[in-house]
C-alpha cells in the first residue's frame, strides 16, 4: 500500500530500516526520537511539532535528531532549551519565541533570541542567589 511505501521511505531516510522489527522499548534514545519523527511524518502533516526533540541525547545524538527534524522540508515548531540547535545555520530557523513565566518575552531572529535567553537565565540565576 501507499502508506507502507511511505513508511519504508521514512525508515530509510532516518536510517531506521535495520531496527524496523525491534520494539520501540528496545531502541536507544536517539532511535526512539527518530522513530517518533518518522511516525509523525507518516501522516503527511503540513508541520511537525516537537517538544524538547534533543532532550536526553548526547551531542551526537542531538545533532542526528535535529538534522532529521529539519531534513524533510516541513515547517518545524518546537520547544527547546538547546541553544546550540537554535544557533545552527543549516537548520534555517527564522523565528524564535522565548517564553518566560508562560508569556512571550522575546520574538525574533535566532541569534538575538539566544542572547536574550542566556541573559534572562543569567538574571534569574543572579536573583535567586540573593
Where are these regions (language model features)?
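Conserved ABC ATPase "signature" region
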Residues: 2-19
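H-loop/switch region of ABC-family ATPase nucleotide-binding domains
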Residues: 79-83
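Conserved D-loop/post-Walker B switch-helix segment of ABC ATPase nucleotide-binding domains
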Residues: 55-67
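Conserved ABC ATPase signature
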Residues: 23-27
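Hydrophobic anchor residue at the start of the ABC signature
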Residues: 37
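Catalytic Walker B motif of ABC-type/P-loop ATPase nucleotide-binding domains
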Residues: 48-52
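Conserved beta-strand-loop-alpha-helix hinge in the C-terminal portion
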Residues: 103-126
Amino acid at each position: 500500500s501507499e502508506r507502507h511505501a511511505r513508511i519504508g521511505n521514512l525508515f530509510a531516510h532516518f536510517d531506521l530500516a535495520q531496527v524496523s522489527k525491534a520494539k520501540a522499548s528496545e531502541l536507544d534514545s536517539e532511535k526512539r526520537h527518530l522513530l517518533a519523527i518518522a511516525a509523525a511524518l507518516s501522516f503527511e502533516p503540513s508541520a511537525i511539532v516537537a517538544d524538547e526533540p534533543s532532550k536526553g541525547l548526547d551531542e551526537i545524538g542531538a545533532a542526528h535528531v535535529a538534522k532529521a527534524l529539519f531534513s524533510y522540508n516541513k515547517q518545524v515548531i518546537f520547544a527547546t532549551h538547546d541553544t546550540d540547535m537554535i544557533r545552527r545555520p543549516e537548520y534555517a530557523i527564522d523565528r524564535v519565541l522565548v517564553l518566560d513565566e508562560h508569556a512571550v518575552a522575546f520574538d525574533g531572529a535566532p541569534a538575538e533570541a539566544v542572547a536574550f535567553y542566556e541573559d534572562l537565565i543569567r538574571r534569574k540565576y543572579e536573583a535567586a542567589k540573593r
